[in-house]
Amino acid sequence: VNNQVTTDEVNSSAFEIDLLSFQLTIGSPIVVQIKHKEGCKPKVLNPEVVKPSASYTITSIASDADGKLTWKTTGESGTLPYIVEQYRWNKWVKVGEVQGKGTAGEHAYTFKVTPHSGKNKVRIKQVDNAGAKTSQDVPFTAKVAQVNYALDPAGKTITFTNTTSQPTETMYEVFDKFGNMMARGYSAKVDVSKLAVGTYYLNYDKSNAEIIIPKRK
């Protein structure tokens, strides 16, 4: 264990290693090496005990109108990423990650979310072997104009504009009728020239729309 030989009795078909005797601190690195004979590969029955756990406690979390999300935590137990999610299009969408510090002290984190128009909701979570541990929802109202879309008559380009008809960048997703994602990104235009004729579903800003790619000349 961390290059130290255990004093536990290991010359048997089943044995237990007592990690308490190594005086490890929560969140510190650990490497367990088991030397064995050829054809006698060991099986670890509870590997989760040396893996990071989502044990954090949030002491504060908030977002400003520009989407700057800040939070503080204590009680982390091992390095796990904080997954940042935003509620868009009637679902939670992953928008990024921040690597956790993994130790028990207080830690501060920041992530810039790209807001959509109007009221927003964001949250963070960590995922370990037991599942996901999710924070409360964090609401904020963004200073972002509503976005409109237009598909050109040739069915080759989707353009996003603001309320003054100026091109504006926004997050988007395009799905076919079977639910397969055909395009995803953040832009003022989407090239759909390679999509086959048919019906598609567009998610953009905070809205949804059905688009029809026409037969091209």
What is each PLM-predicted segment?
Residues 172-182, 200-202:
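Short, glycine-anchored, charge-dense loop/turn motifs used at functional sites
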Residues 100-102, 187-190:
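A short acidic/small-residue loop/turn micro-motif
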Residues 75-78, 163-173:
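A short beta-turn/strand-edge loop motif at beta-sheet boundaries
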Residues 153-158, 197-206:
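Short, contiguous hydrophobic alpha-helices characteristic of membrane insertion segments
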Residues 1-150, 208-209:
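Short, compositionally biased serine/threonine- and acidic-rich segments at solvent-exposed termini, linkers
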Residues 69-73, 158-164:
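Aromatic/hydrophobic beta-strand junction motif of beta-rich domains
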Residues 84, 124, 171-172, 200:
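Generic short beta-strand
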Residues 209-215:
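Extended, polar beta-sheet/loop recognition surfaces of beta-rich domains
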